[in-house]
Amino acid sequence: MFSKHDQIRGYDDELLAAMDAEEARQEDHLELIASENYTSKRVMQAQGSGLTNKYAEGYPGKRYYGGCEHVDKVERLAIDRARQLFGADYANVQPHSGSSANAAVYLALLNAGDTILGMSLAHGGHLTHGAKVSSSGKLYNAVQYGLDTATGLIDYDEVERLAVEHKPKMIVAGFSAYSKTLDFPRFRAIADKVGALLFVDMAHVAGLVAAGLYPNPIPFADVVTTTTHKTLRGPRGGLILARANEEIEKKLNSAVFPGAQGGPLMHVIAAKAVCFKEALEPGFKDYQAQVIRNAKAMAEVFIGRGYDVVSGGTDNHLMLISLVRQGLTGKEADAALGRVGITVNKNAVPNDPQSPFVTSGIRIGTPAITTRGLQEAQSRELAGWICDILDHLGDADVEAKVATQVAGLCADFPVYR
């Protein structure tokens, strides 16, 4: 029999030590991975609740198990809040991740072998947009578009040319490392020209969209997916949204369950509901506006210090920095910055001469540092420290100085006060 007073401490101290070390790392490092953020303690409370015990295959009011009357209310709250937040008619809150949400969209609306047109992973797209190593590139005939090498921007004329040539059943708009604003009306026009469905993966910018600071794809897309973490600051999970379309809604629901998943994670759905409520608060827009201001401030410093920011700057929360001119690799930069308490991720740049395990760039995002409370002044300072490390790669004295500066900034701006 379990006790309500059971604790990990004293029972599994080996595991607890690793958990505590990770929490300490989050407090003592400046997190600049664009896809990472910190959740509120409310979100964590929901994920650690008794809802983790409940199986609830099916949908509210149509479950395959009894005893679902309370979790039905939880899921309906999450659905209603998601619809309100994004102005959608339909929301499915059950996908376990963004990738599983994307897989469900393909399963719902495509047949194996159908052609999809998505952004190349090498140019800032995502694995699930047709990369050959992904199921999206194995099950479907994936054609890829990319950036204009001269401007660093999506070449919409090339997207249209590829669409006319290959006649895709679905066009995928979305990215994992693109710092400019997507032209959803142009994507819609291209899709209509060739009779394709338009699928938008807004995982990286969902928080900006919710705040009204980035164009909302809902009016233009046939279906939209997102993660619920990243800029939304919720639990790790997925979400599918759409305008009213009974046929598509039915296909999407069936693709998620029973097509791709079994029982939903009700404790995570509760945490999603909390996250959506937080995002509906007036202060959420202020937070997202600061995310963008911080990103722009950092990009200005990098450009001023002679670093190439792909696409020439940023309109959102992230930037991709090419290190080709400096003769550095992303792997080297990632490791050096990690030694001083700054966490980034190595990332391929367009036409990258290095392998995906080495790369010639780093991706930087501001959602997490903005959650800590950093503003433009601290963001510029931080960008300068990054340049100092990269300008003097491997210099122990520079690393020691920056590590001290990072520790001071972390102490001044704790994640949880």
Swiss-Prot record:
Keyword Amino-acid biosynthesis appears in the UniProt entry: yes
InterPro entries: PyrdxlP-dep_Trfase, PyrdxlP-dep_Trfase_major, PyrdxlP-dep_Trfase_small, Ser_HO-MeTrfase, Ser_HO-MeTrfase-like, Ser_HO-MeTrfase_PLP_BS, SHMT-like_dom
Top-level taxon: Bacteria
Enzyme category, top tier: transferase
Family statement: Belongs to the SHMT family.
Entry keywords, A to Z: Amino-acid biosynthesis, Cytoplasm, One-carbon metabolism, Pyridoxal phosphate, Transferase
EC numbers on record: 2.1.2.1
Annotated positions of the N6-(pyridoxal phosphate)lysine modification: K230
Reactions listed under catalytic activity: (6R)-5,10-methylene-5,6,7,8-tetrahydrofolate + glycine + H2O = (6S)-5,6,7,8-tetrahydrofolate + L-serine
Pathway membership, UniProt: One-carbon metabolism; tetrahydrofolate interconversion; Amino-acid biosynthesis; glycine biosynthesis; glycine from L-serine: step 1/1
High-level lineage: Bacteria, Pseudomonadati, Pseudomonadota, Gammaproteobacteria, Pseudomonadales
Record-annotated site: Plays an important role in substrate specificity: H229
Pfam families found in the cross-reference section: SHMT
Alphabetized Gene3D superfamilies for the sequence: Aspartate Aminotransferase, domain 1, Type I PLP-dependent aspartate aminotransferase-like (Major domain)
MF annotations from Gene Ontology: glycine hydroxymethyltransferase activity; pyridoxal phosphate binding
Function summary: Catalyzes the reversible interconversion of serine and glycine with tetrahydrofolate (THF) serving as the one-carbon carrier. This reaction serves as the major source of one-carbon groups required for the biosynthesis of purines, thymidylate, methionine, and other important biomolecules. Also exhibits THF-independent aldolase activity toward beta-hydroxyamino acids, producing glycine and aldehydes, via a retro-aldol mechanism.
Localization annotation: Cytoplasm
Necessary cofactors: pyridoxal 5'-phosphate
Subunit note: Homodimer.
GO CC annotation: cytoplasm; cytosol
Listed GO biological process terms: glycine biosynthetic process from serine; tetrahydrofolate interconversion; tetrahydrofolate metabolic process
Name of this protein: Serine hydroxymethyltransferase 1
SUPFAM superfamilies assigned to the protein according to its UniProt record, in alphabetical order: PLP-dependent transferases
UniProt-annotated binding residues for (6S)-5,6,7,8-tetrahydrofolate: L121, G125, H126, L127, S355, P356, F357
